[in-house]
Amino acid sequence: MNDQPVANTTSFGAIGFGFSLLLLSLNMAQILDSNAMGVILATGLFAGGLTPLIAGLWSLKTGNSFAATAYILAATFWFSYAFIYFLPALGLITPVTEPAIAMLVQMPFFFLWGLLAFWLFLSSMKANRVLQINFFLLAIFLWLVAFGYFHAWETWNATTIADITLVWIAGWVGVAAGFVGIYYGLASVLNETYKRDIMPLGQVPPST
């Protein structure tokens, strides 16, 4: 029987997703130009999609159900989000030309993913504090985007992401979530390498 230790995949999965979320959030916070969407989607497919998918599948092997679920869902989010843009570009579906309508059809997408992120937050109560903060911020980010898109459609006064205050706020929440995710990944590598908590994660004490 092979007793060789299996590497911890949580580090690169968290870094990949956090980096992709950071780019998307910087775009929504109006730090990146709208023309950067191609870079964001390409990064999302590989760093935010493929990397967490590998981490999630490897977590199945180690018996870590929570990590497997979280990372595979993260990969699914980025694959789905990228194809929202790719399918019209490839001519496979009719593109939506009215910006407010395009935002409306994405509203349930972000809202439902926000529910999943909040469920992961609740499921992380026995994990470390950094992970809890990450999922909580992610849920708030997704819900703010959803409500911002709905408001844009309802008032019909937005033509771009830059016109939506809620989405701008969401962008900064997403920036925080992205940095927290990257911190979690880097801390996992560093702490495991040096066998001590160099970058604190806020471990939850075991319940009695």
Segments the model singles out, each with a brief description of its role:
Residues 1-55, 59:
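N-terminal topogenic module of multi-pass integral membrane proteins
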Residues 1-8, 21, 191-208:
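Extramembrane terminal tails and long inter-domain/linker segments of multi-pass membrane proteins
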Residues 1-6, 27-38, 64-67, 91-102, ...:
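Short juxtamembrane and helix-loop transition motifs at transmembrane-helix boundaries
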Residues 36-48, 98-112, 172-175:
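Structural signature of hydrophobic alpha-helical transmembrane segments
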Residues 52-62, 119-126, 188:
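C-terminal ends of transmembrane helices
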Residues 53-81:
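Hydrophobic/aromatic-rich structural module bridging two neighboring secondary-structure elements via a short loop
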Residues 75-96:
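C-terminal halves and exits of single transmembrane alpha-helices
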Residues 106-122, 129-156, 162-187:
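Alpha-helical membrane segments in multi-pass integral membrane proteins
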